[in-house]
Amino acid sequence: ADGTFRPTGTLSGNAFMKMLLGALGYDSSIEGYTGPNWSINVAKRALNVGLEDGLEGSFNGTKAVTREEACLYAFNTLKATMVEYENNNSVTVNGITFTNKSTAKEMANTGKTDGNIGSKDGKMQFAEKYFTDLKDNDVTNDFAQPAIKWTLKAEKIGTYDKTADQTYTGEVKLGDIYSDLNMSSKDSAEYYIDGTAQDNQDVKKGNDKKVGV
């Protein structure tokens, strides 16, 4: 943030996040990513847009970023929404410059790449702009668990399981699942055993019926 180039220095989590936010379109001068409080502003925005999603433990931007962390943050950037600014202009009167700075606005995507990453939301994700042949699709694995399949053109990159909201070993009451997930209304959930569909189960408050093996 001080403008110096130190190629042999370590890269902190905050510094790397600043680079990624810049790639998403955030303007350092407008967002306060320079000066004494730059790291606070960077960390706040990075966590707000989910660049640390999937990180084990808490984000510590003062520490040097590991290779694994760098890969995770860069991967999350692919899925993050880009931003742009409107009506940025300046006028100089008698040697004094007045600048009108707008706030960051999510970039719209009205093209054919909308929906390549995540749902079709009308917003431009980083990969939808710069990696137009990269796609993720919701699928299920051999055990009917939710997963994501990544492809580049016609080539399959891989299928990866989604992280479960809750995991149990052995039997569990449907009412306990309801409580553990902080649900507010009952749900008729699809139920599979080793990939084979069973009867739907009512996940609702106080249901003592057990599922699992």
Residue spans for each PLM region:
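Long, low-hydrophobicity ectodomains and other hydrophilic envelope-associated domains
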Residues: Y160-V211
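N-terminal propeptides
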Residues: A1-D180
